[in-house]
């Protein structure tokens, strides 16, 4: 239960500022879904991360917030990663006049802060966040859970680990759980926990040049 988790990549790394969201949207044919009226409306996505700043692109669609780290009441993000993830998932593009829009701009978001300002956290906090989601999934209409964090190390590479059992419990409760694979692959044992679960959707990069 004391296992340490971290973000799947360092958000403070000094790299050229580029946006790949629009290119990815073309790759997965988001526009086709939009023409059918599928924008995420009516679906709440829970994001287990560093929290969420009430950004103008989605501030009126944060339907729930919990802070299991500092126990503060209102939405905030002292790291930035959780806000970044919420923007990719459900940003409206309002600030950029529609130029940078998330994948599901009509969805609502339930942000659960399980990581601290440095992007680190514990398995216990992630499990507490999953418990919060399960308790409120019907009330908030949560159907999807995004977890862009993970734990490396052979000790965590077990389907009997508490983290894997936690995400499996969410899946068995009818939630679609999407977890980051990590950034150390492709190589044996490079997928982080809880991405090793056989039940969840574990996602890695689809383009080596991104």
Ranges and model annotations:
Residues 50-53, 207-208:
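Acidic glycine-/aspartate-rich tracts in secreted/extracellular proteins
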Residues 25-28, 92, 127-130:
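Short, well-ordered amphipathic alpha-helical segments that serve as non-catalytic structural scaffolds
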Residues 2-46, 66-80:
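N-terminal domain-start motif of subtilase-like serine proteases
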Residues 34-45, 52-64, 72-124, 140-143, ...:
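Subtilisin-like serine protease catalytic core
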